Amino acid sequence: MELETLISWLLFSTSLFWFLFLATKTKSKPPKTPSSTTNTPIPKSYPIFGSAFSLLANFHRRIQWTSDILQTIPSSTFVLHRPFGARQVFTAQPAVVQHILRTNFTCYGKGLTFYQSINDFLGDGIFNADGESWKFQRQISSHEFNTRSLRKFVETVVDVELSDRLVPVLSQASNSQTTLDFQDILQRLTFDNICMIAFGYDPEYLLPSLPEIPFAKAFDESSQLSIERLNALIPLLWKVKRFLNIGVERQLKEAVAEVRGLATKIVKNKKKELKEKALQSESESVDLLSRFLSSGHSDESFVTDMVISIILAGRDTTSAALTWFFWLLSKHSHVENEILKEITGKSETVGYDEVKDMVYTHAALCESMRLYPPLPVDTKVAVHDDVLPDGTLVKKGWRVTYHIYAMGRSEKIWGPDWAEFRPERWLSRDEVGKWSFVGIDYYSYPVFQAGPRVCIGKEMAFLQMKRVVAGIMGRFRVVPAMVEGIEPEYTAHFTSVMKGGFPVKIEKRSPLV
């Protein structure tokens, strides 16, 4: 710890000395892009250190800070100067999003910085892959995600988790009038679900005792510390710590070892299980790992990387979306009533066809994710020089970030009522009062990405979320137990979270008829 502190102070002191010296000698020049006007709040930039001072001052609210800048710029695009000459383009313009995600897709990849930051945790999984590796994983994943048998398996997994675990936990909280952290409950629920769907492995995270599970804890630490690497202003610092195996880098190494150790063990056991089933002519398992192995992809490292990426993508995004959804629902009783009308008369285990009919619920989930997207930003790296549709020059190696959070709050996209939680903006209603979903193009609403990298698990995510919403709302009312009038803080790790959790009371609802 003393060595780590010494190294950190040496790097910080050297950086601070040069920053103060250069700041007194040189004033910044605004970047030569269409975003640069004398009235925009683009932060000052200094030689070597760029806009590090502004970045550090706003790091705790960097999502909101960069969103605020984008809202005041006519082009909805600006260039941020990072330390040591690096540049990062931020945009909230649909035409630019379409350009980087579809029109000029081959120019923009994950990049070396992302790969190095995440590789220890995700390996070469689809979430961390580019080029031919990504294409191959995308192809086999798309095939498996679109099978009817997987959809039925997802339905079964979610139904069992709801009836056997979530409902008893909420009933117990209602009877005892205890306060629950609903964000934690949803994270446990979705972790159990996605582990079963991906691995056929039940971590038993959502039990009445709300146990601490080493695998879940290690998974959280691995994702959080990996994203801290990615957000580091001075990447050299974490690389030095990793080399010396000290501080958070030692913690990350231990967490990753726990995750990958158990994952590898599960893969080995699954291969053995599949061989035994084949010998006994038993029906095959339908979880994703079994599907990958049965289709000839037997390399343990490859399938482990793929499945860990799927768990990461499916766990935190779904719980984040549901957390903010239930908070917004508590503030808008008319939306709650419309959803209750929609689920009234449906079976306790809502079937696939019934889920498809939950049009208003679908719109409410989309509207919630517009204001509070599970993934607030997404960043690509330019493979070669490019010019964006608004004229912004992008050099090879520059980061280009499309700001999903800012786009969901853009008056240019959503109109003057953008701040209102209004599911009806996604709907049309016929003369007999039946809702139909209208939607919006992916490039104005890139919550599930767009183009070739559009989320392959989107339909599975909506299936899971709508079944959970119906399962909870048909039995309980979720009542926030936080200070009245204070909005929870939206903050981002790998995905968004409600800072400090979501304390709630659970009230039993009269049976819907």
UniProtKB/Swiss-Prot annotation:
Keywords: Endoplasmic reticulum, Heme, Iron, Membrane, Metal-binding, Monooxygenase, Oxidoreductase, Transmembrane, Transmembrane helix
Transmembrane segments: 7-24
SUPFAM superfamilies noted in UniProt: Cytochrome P450 (SSF48264)
Taxonomic superkingdom: Eukaryota
Record-level GO cellular component terms: endoplasmic reticulum membrane
Main subcellular localisation: endoplasmic reticulum
Enzyme Commission number, as recorded: 1.14.-.-
Keyword Methyltransferase in record: no
Compartment(s) of residence: Endoplasmic reticulum membrane
Cofactor or coenzyme needed: heme
Gene3D superfamilies: Cytochrome P450 (1.10.630.10)
Enzyme class, spelled out: oxidoreductase
Assigned protein family: Belongs to the cytochrome P450 family.
Protein's name in the database: Cytochrome P450 94A2
